[in-house]
Amino acid sequence: MEDEEKMSGCEHYAPGPASGARVQKDGEKWTLILVRELRHPPAMVWQAITDPAHLHDWAPFEADGNLDSVGATVKLTWVSTGAVSETRVTRADAPSLLEYHDLRWQLEPLGRGTRLTLWHNIDRRFIAWGAASWHICFDVLDRLLAGAPIGRIAGAEAMKFDGWQRLKAEYATQFGS
């Protein structure tokens, strides 16, 4: 029943326009940088980005363990591809900075909320795809933290939304890809 309720919320979801993203090139490395202002305090956002039970509800991957401590080794299974990678948390300064795999998360207090910045090292060919996907994941995260979950929208599920295709096109235009 709970999954059905989440899916019904998902049916009424439509992402806003592409925003809060940029690309940085350093040699051969490309980094997608996304900034999102959330209405929730850093401690709450920290739990959502480190706890596997919370990640399951919004992130584009499953984590088999908690990501909240340096040295933690966790397997990530990406929803879009099923690819599994073992990663080690290299930085965990709760509730402000988290680094593992190709991801770096920074949480900054912003009034009663949080400015979330994600750096994602990504293949240049997939930058617009990644930006559209993270955009939707962050929308889902915001609703989850507000107590109005709509269910995970990631991987193939995200691509079914007309909004995902529009976002991907908007980000592709923005990034010239």
Task: Please place each PLM-identified region on the residue numbering.
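Terminal "cap-and-tail" regions of soluble proteins that handle hydrophobic small molecules
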Residues: M1-G27, G111-S177
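A structural signal for short hydrophobic beta-strand segments in well-ordered beta-sheet cores
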Residues: V23, V89, W105-L107
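Short beta-edge strand/loop motif at the mouth of beta-sheet-based domains
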Residues: K25-L34, H40, M44, P52-P95, ...
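Solvent-exposed residues in well-ordered beta-strands and their adjoining turns
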Residues: E37-P41, T77, E108, W119-D123
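Short, conserved charged micro-motifs
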Residues: A43-Q47, A128
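Short, flexible helix/strand-to-coil boundary loops that buttress conserved ligand/catalytic motifs
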Residues: I49, A59, L145
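Short beta-strand segments
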Residues: A83-T87, L103, T114
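Short, solvent-exposed secondary-structure boundary/capping segments
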Residues: S96-D102
